[in-house]
Amino acid sequence: MGCGSSSKKGKKSEKVVRAALIIQNWYRRYRARLSARQHYALAIFQSIEYADEQGQMQLSSFFSFMLENYTNTHKEDSALVSRLFENTRLESKDREEYVGLIDVPDSYDGPRLQFPLTFTDINLLLQAFKQQQTLHAHYVLEVLFEARKILKQMPNFTRIQTFPAKEITICGDLHGKLDDLMLIFYKNGLPSEKNPYVFNGDFVDRGNNSMEILMILLVSFLVYPTDLHLNRGNHEDFMMNLRYGFTKEILQKYKLHGKKILQVLEELYTWLPIGTIIDNEILVIHGGISESTDLNILQQLQRNKMKSVLMPPMSTNQECNIKKNKAGPSEQSASEQLTKLEWEQIIDLLWSDPRGKKGCYPNTSRGGGCYFGPDVTSKVLNKNQLKMVIRSHECKPDGYEICHDGKVITVFSASNYYEEGSNRGAYIRLSYGTSPQFFQYQVTSTSCLNPLYQRVNAMEFSAFRILKERMIARKTDLINAFELRDHSRTGKISLAQWAFSMESILGLNLPWRSLSSHLVSTDSSGSVDYMSSFDDIHIEKPMKDMKSDLIETMYRYRSDLKIIFNIIDTDQSGLISMDEFRTMWKLFNAHYKVHIDDSQIDELASTMDSNKDGNIDFNEFLRAFYVVHKYETPESPLNK
């Protein structure tokens, strides 16, 4: 009896164990599938982000092209070239023009700063921003002017000592995400003499609270100028702000004085230090290095000459051409520009990314800077008697990443960067003679508390949504590529042919075969119905009878065109003349090799001038180009 009972219990236990193992294996496979989907979604987000930055960097070559051509065709208009290539000279203007003439009314119920600033003002600002109050333009401008005054006295690289017992915190990109900064201060404490910080660039753009972050950092810097350190990132650049949102944010929050704020901010960026060196061992820079990185050159160049990474130095011929066409004497000379070598040194510092492959080669994803391998890291560190590079610039799923045998650390402080739940944020604490300590976090909201599969669904939905927008902007080119391989005109090609066509046209370096089930229909034999790629999406036409190639071109380059025409609009009226539109479009057409007939452009310009006054509201026109999705929720067939 006893033995039989024991045998039954043993068999029952075996069944329980087997069932538990089956459930465990199923759950592991389930988590692996979710992890793969999350990985693909992040790959899409990052590829498109870098492709956009590549497009932004390509504007640099267009501006050089424009400099050669626009000044020849519009000799009477020197304001545009001045705006693009000449440094702002705020010193020649009375500060009272910006600050003194702006009164703070009694009705203003936001924070009132008292200069000279103290720790109380930092707290006041934090509490006000938590309550979604807006700092008055008078105080914003005063903070910008005061910060500029101190920044101008600082070297290109700030040097910090943690020896013997000091700790310092290093934060990466924040990108306008105020909740992340608040969480860092909550977990790690506010800046002070005993709690120093380095903020490693990219404070602004993308998020909705770039101004609030900038004001908190600058006010903290003014209170603790030797304990809070600010490095310039690639987004501390007025041209980047035009594309990625900070300019728009300022003009919306400060409708009356936004233009003044932008002008002062444009110059303040140029005075931000380009790096920090800790204990003569650790180099903290925003992007990275290259095999030609020379700290001697970087420490001696005049950083304020770098107005924008998109504004390359003028050649002597270009400078002479501008002077010849200007009505008055030129205030800018070649000596007031960076040399090409100096400009490239800063580009590498702000834009480069580490890779596992040895060597140094062009950063084709971003279009600026380089990829640098572990051998390059060792060479630059050894040459300068340094031990480590801490950089930011790249979103990492865990908020940080260590590579190059521990000699390069990436730290990224904006959690949920692409989408809720897409990544953690992190910061680093350093003290002398010890290994870096990493602290991770993630700002939580109602959606972040959802089950993992719902968060992955939401990420995946957003990722494929923006990928489809990329596809529709190249619809004509994609169809031509598909039809080139569809010799029998069946409307179908192989999966390999479809994947090759997608990569050759879009150039996003994505695993197209793995993504195909979300993007296209296949038959039982595995052949791809390539036109199904566009079944659930189209670009809205702002005008009837507009040709598809023109629609796609305008949509594809809408961000670039918006930047270009905002620069042409020197008086910020929102209007440009018909002649300016035609001339600039033809230059754009020639440089980007866009095949649009001049007759189409003339017709387009005439249609855009709705009231026939010779002016065009170009920003309003661009807003008329938008993509229509048939499915707008994560529960759509896209995710089933």
Curated annotation (Swiss-Prot):
Active-site feature positions: 235 (proton donor)
E.C. numbers: 3.1.3.16
Residue segments, region Catalytic: 122-445
Name of the top EC class for this enzyme: hydrolase
GO molecular function: calcium ion binding; iron ion binding; manganese ion binding; protein serine/threonine phosphatase activity
Residues annotated as binding Ca(2+) 2: 609, 611, 613, 615, 620
GO terms classed as biological process: detection of stimulus involved in sensory perception
IQ domain span: 16-45
GO CC terms: cytosol; nucleus
Keyword field: Calcium, Hydrolase, Magnesium, Manganese, Metal-binding, Protein phosphatase, Repeat
Binding site for Mn(2+) 1: 173, 175, 202
Lineage: superkingdom: Eukaryota
CDD domains: EFh, MPP_RdgC
Gene3D superfamilies, per the entry: 3.60.21.10, EF-hand
Residue numbers binding Mn(2+) 2: 202, 234, 286, 393
Cofactor annotation comment: Binds 2 manganese ions per subunit.
Regulation of protein activity: Activated by calcium.
Cross-referenced InterPro entries: Calcineurin-like_PHP_ApaH (IPR004843), EF-hand-dom_pair (IPR011992), EF_Hand_1_Ca_BS (IPR018247), EF_hand_dom (IPR002048), Metallo-depent_PP-like (IPR029052), PPP_dom (IPR013235), PPP_phosphatase (IPR051134), Ser/Thr-Pase_EF-hand_contain (IPR012008)
Disulfide pattern: none
Function per UniProt: May have a role in the recovery or adaptation response of photoreceptors. May have a role in development.
Family that this chain belongs to: Belongs to the PPP phosphatase family.
PANTHER family: SERINE/THREONINE-PROTEIN PHOSPHATASE 5-RELATED, SERINE_THREONINE-PROTEIN PHOSPHATASE WITH EF-HANDS 1
Descriptive protein name: Serine/threonine-protein phosphatase with EF-hands 1
Gene, per the UniProt record: Ppef1
